[in-house]
Amino acid sequence: MKYKSFLIKYGEIGVKGKNRYMFEDALMKQIRTALKDVEGKFNVSKELGRIYVDMDGDYDYEEAIDRLSKVFGIVGICPMVRIESKDYENLKVKVVEYVDAVYPYKNFTFKVDTRRADKSFPGTSESINAELGEVILNAFPEMKVNVRKPDVLIKVEIRTYINIYSVEIPGPGGMPIGTNGSAMLLLSGGIDSPVAGYMIAKRGVRVEAVYFHAPPYTSERAKRKVIELAELVSKYSGPLNLHIINFTDIQLAIYEHCPHDELTIIMRRYMMKLAERIAVENGDQALITGESIGQVASQTIQSLLTTDAAATLPVFRPLIGFDKQEIVEISEKIGTYETSIQPYEDCCTIFVAKHPVTKPVLENIERSEEKLEGIIDELMEKAMETKERILVKA
C-alpha cells in the first residue's frame, strides 16, 4: 500500500506543559531537515496534539522511514490513511479497503480502537468499534476478534479528518535536537565516544566534536575513520562541526618532559583544555567524553577527577555506568561499531605507559606539568591556530 500520510508520535514532549509548543516546533523542524534530501514533497504540520507528515505525489517510502526513525523526539511513526469525508458509511468502506490493502493474508485476530476527538461524529467510541469490527468480519470471515491480545490493533482517530492506522515503526525517543543547548564531544576512533555523542544528542543537545590527530604517529586513514564516525553520529544528531587538532607536538613535549606513568592523564588534561577553548569559542555549555568507570587505567574515579580539574565547563559522561558489552550493543544499533573496530591507531593509543598511574593525585600531576612551562603555551596556541573544521553531515 502506498501511504500518503504519517502520524508522528512523541513521548516526553507531551508532558512539557506551557512550553510544549516549543518542543513540538523543534521536532517539526528536525523532521523537515531529515526529509529535506528524500525524493518527494513533504508537508509537516501539527493539529490538536498530533504531528503529521503528508506526502504530495510519489516519494521514497523506505528512505523516508529510515530518516524519520533517526529523529530524536519521535517514539513512533505510523503510516496511515487519511479520510477527509466524515461520512460514516464512507468510513466503513475505507476501513475494509485499508485492511485488504495492508494485510493480504487475513488469518489473524484484530481489534478496532476508536478515538472520537470530534464529538459531533455520531455514536460513541465503543459503538463505532463494534460496528467497524462487524463490517470487517463480514468482509473477511477468516479474521477473528480478540479484544485482549489481538494480533493487529486497528486504530481509528476521528478529528478534523479521520485517520486509520495499525502499524507503528519505533523511533529513537529522546528530545528534539537543539532544545537542551550544545556541547563539545571529544571524539576518538574507538567504540565509546561515538556512542556518548549519540546518547547526549538523544537528550536534545546539539553536538559538536573535536578530534586530536597526531601525524605521523596516526595516519590519514585514522583521521578518515573519525570523520566517518562523525558522519554516522550526524544521522541522528544532524549536521555537526568536527574540529581537528594537530596534537603531535604537545604529545611529544609531554613524553619528553613528564613522568611516563603520568603520560595518559596529562595528555587527557591538555585535550580537555583545548576542547574547552574550542567549546567556549563556539558557545557550547559542556564537554562530552565516552569514559566509563574502571574500563581502563585512565578511567578510575581519581583519574576522572584529575582530568576534570583541567576544565571549568561541566563534563558529561553518559556511559559512566555502562559495561563494555552494553556500549558495544548500542554502537551496533546505531551503526558505528564496524567503523570503530577498524584497526587504525589514534593518539590515545600511542605513547602509552606500561604501568600508568591509576590513582593520580592532582597536586603531583600539576607539579609534573610545571616542567612544561615555557613550552606548552606556545604549542597550545599553534594547535589552535592550525586547527581544521569540517561540517559533517550524513
Model regions and ranges:
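RNA-binding accessory domains that recognize and position tRNA/RNA substrates
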Residues: M1-M184, P194-N241, A309, V357-L362, ...
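Structural beta-sheet core signal
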Residues: L185, A209-Y211, I244, T289, ...
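Conserved G/P- and acidic residue-centered "switch" motifs that form tight phosphate/ATP-binding loops
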Residues: G190
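A conserved beta-strand->alpha-helix junction
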Residues: A230-E256, D346-C347
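Small/polar glycine-rich anion-binding or flexible loop at a beta-alpha turn
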Residues: Q295, P343-F351
